[in-house]
């Protein structure tokens, strides 16, 4: 979250940022809570000073009448302090709720927009394949090649679940190994993270764990949630820690990701594109404030490198203000070309990377020492590989007229085969 002093000192900037993000928040309510809280803290301090004076006066050699008066005065002061502290506790909790709703300040070069249609294309890379046949979408390809089964998954688990089968199993594992090998060579520490996180960690990362708008699953009768991304478990790894940040601390984590995807429907959400469970390799970095823009750009370069080596055409987007998550200062999306998307093919999101500055670290109390002072770290996240959407892009871009699919050269050493043959 933002520093409260920063909010008070920059009210118009914060107000404009809220407007640009398409949010309706009661900033004045936050300030009124803080004003009253400050007054209460001052008043409680004054009353405690009076109570101490009263207690010291009772140590003097005084008559019974004066002692009785001081005792009653002490009781009255104690009762008043308790009442004010109860009010202070209530105000502090209300203040925290409103405070957490305030999004991060957006970077100066974030485009202002009201929908994802106003995301700005920064770069287009790769050659869109030209087929001498009508290309199939990944659903047709996968069913024909016996790579996944949605019907059985619907019976067993419900809508938006799937079984991966046969070569698709090797292909998913190959993508994960490919990403991990690349990130290990780039100096990342590798993790397989828990698929469950406590509520205060989920909340600290900036995911809203409660309410109808929540996109993650709560485990009943616990304070735990299934994670929607390893960003949650990697970001929480150093909760309440003071780090020795001689250099940026880079981590890469594999997790299953669970999403409710409530209300998601339509042709662009079919098949593997929007599902309740998938695997993802996530990149994460804890760094000093002066390094975060550079690391953010490095994460984008890594994502581009991955999709270039997978031979998948893509474009890079500078995400507009209303499409930013609350923690993000700036965000890039990569969209891969998917020939089976829509009538004539279209781009679909496959990765993103966000610089969240110190928004998450303030909630999670993750700091570093500099010149004898504790400062909040900056936190950057990014997708290396999201299994399902990358699988879509591979199946659709590398299909051939015979109904088979070529495997990208960079994955062959991990799959052990270079072609998925049509089934008779």
Curated annotation (Swiss-Prot):
Q: Detail which positions bind L-serine.
A: 229-231, 282, 383
- This enzyme's EC code(s): 6.1.1.11
Q: One Pfam family name from the record?
A: Seryl_tRNA_N
* Subcellular compartments: Cytoplasm
Which one of the record's GO molecular function terms can you name?
A: ATP binding
Gene Ontology biological process terms in this record = selenocysteine biosynthetic process; seryl-tRNA aminoacylation
Pathway listed for it?
Answer: Aminoacyl-tRNA biosynthesis; selenocysteinyl-tRNA(Sec) biosynthesis; L-seryl-tRNA(Sec) from L-serine and tRNA(Sec): step 1/1
- Chief localisation class: cytoplasm
- Gene Ontology cellular component? cytoplasm
Keyword annotations for this protein?
Aminoacyl-tRNA synthetase, ATP-binding, Cytoplasm, Ligase, Nucleotide-binding, Protein biosynthesis
Residues annotated as binding ATP? 259-261, 275, 349-352
Q: Which residues form the signal peptide?
A: none
Q: What class of enzyme is it?
A: ligase
Q: Which reaction does it catalyse?
A: tRNA(Ser) + L-serine + ATP = L-seryl-tRNA(Ser) + AMP + diphosphate + H(+); tRNA(Sec) + L-serine + ATP = L-seryl-tRNA(Sec) + AMP + diphosphate + H(+)
- Subunit structure, briefly? Homodimer. The tRNA molecule binds across the dimer.
Q: Which PANTHER family match?
A: SERYL-TRNA SYNTHETASE
Q: Which family does it belong to?
A: Belongs to the class-II aminoacyl-tRNA synthetase family. Type-1 seryl-tRNA synthetase subfamily.
Q: What is known of its domains?
A: Consists of two distinct domains, a catalytic core and a N-terminal extension that is involved in tRNA binding.
Q: What does this protein do?
A: Catalyzes the attachment of serine to tRNA(Ser). Is also able to aminoacylate tRNA(Sec) with serine, to form the misacylated tRNA L-seryl-tRNA(Sec), which will be further converted into selenocysteinyl-tRNA(Sec).
The family database entries (HAMAP family) matched by this protein are listed as: Ser_tRNA_synth_type1
| Annotated protein name in UniProt | Serine--tRNA ligase
User: Whose protein is this, by species?
Assistant: Borrelia duttonii (strain Ly)
Organism lineage string:
Bacteria, Pseudomonadati, Spirochaetota, Spirochaetia, Spirochaetales
């Amino acid at each position: 979250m933002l520093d409260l002093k920063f909010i008070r000192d920059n009210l118009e900037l914060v107000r404009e940022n809220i407007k640009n993000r398409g949010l309706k928040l009661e900033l004045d309510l936050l300030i009124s809570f803080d004003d009253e809280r400050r007054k209460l803290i001052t008043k409680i301090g004054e009353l405690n000073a009076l109570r101490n004076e009263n207690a010291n006066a009772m140590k003097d050699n005084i008559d019974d009448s004066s002692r009785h008066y001081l005792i009653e005065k002490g009781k009255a002061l104690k009762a008043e302090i308790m009442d004010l502290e109860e009010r202070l506790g209530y105000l502090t909790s209300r203040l925290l709720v409103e405070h957490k709703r305030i999004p991060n300040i957006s970077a100066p070069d974030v485009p202002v927009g009201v929908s994802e249609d106003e995301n700005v294309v920064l770069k287009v890379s790769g050659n869109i394949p030209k087929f001498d046949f009508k290309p199939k979408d990944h659903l047709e390809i996968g069913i024909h090649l016996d790579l996944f089964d949605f019907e059985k998954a619907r019976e067993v688990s419900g809508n938006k679940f799937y079984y991966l089968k046969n070569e698709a199993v090797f292909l998913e594992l190959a993508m994960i190994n490919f990403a991990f090998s690349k990130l290990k060579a780039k100096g990342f520490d590798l993790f397989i993270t828990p698929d469950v996180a406590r509520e205060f960690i989920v909340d600290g990362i900036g995911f809203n764990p409660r309410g109808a708008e929540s996109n993650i699953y709560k485990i009943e009768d616990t304070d735990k949630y299934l994670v929607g991304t390893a960003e949650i478990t990697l970001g929480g790894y150093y909760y309440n820690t003071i780090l020795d940040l001689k250099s940026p601390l880079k981590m890469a984590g594999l997790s299953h990701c669970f999403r409710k995807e409530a209300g998601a429907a339509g042709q662009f959400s079919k098949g593997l594109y929007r599902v309740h469970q998938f695997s993802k390799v996530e990149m994460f970095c804890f760094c000093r404030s002066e390094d975060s823009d550079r690391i953010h750009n490095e994460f984008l370069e890594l994502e581009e490198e991955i999709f270039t080596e997978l031979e998948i055409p893509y474009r890079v987007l500078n995400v507009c203000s209303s499409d930013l998550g609350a923690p993000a200062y700036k965000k890039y999306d990569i969209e891969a070309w998917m020939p089976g998307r829509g009538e004539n093919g279209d781009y679909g999101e496959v990765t993103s990377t966000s610089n969240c500055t110190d928004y998450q670290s303030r909630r999670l109390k993750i700091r570093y020492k500099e010149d004898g002072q504790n400062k909040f770290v900056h936190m950057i996240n990014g997708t290396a590989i999201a299994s399902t959407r990358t699988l879509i892009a591979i199946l659709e871009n590398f299909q051939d007229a015979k109904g088979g699919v070529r495997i990208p050269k960079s994955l062959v050493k991990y799959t052990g085969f270079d072609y998925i043959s049509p089934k008779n």
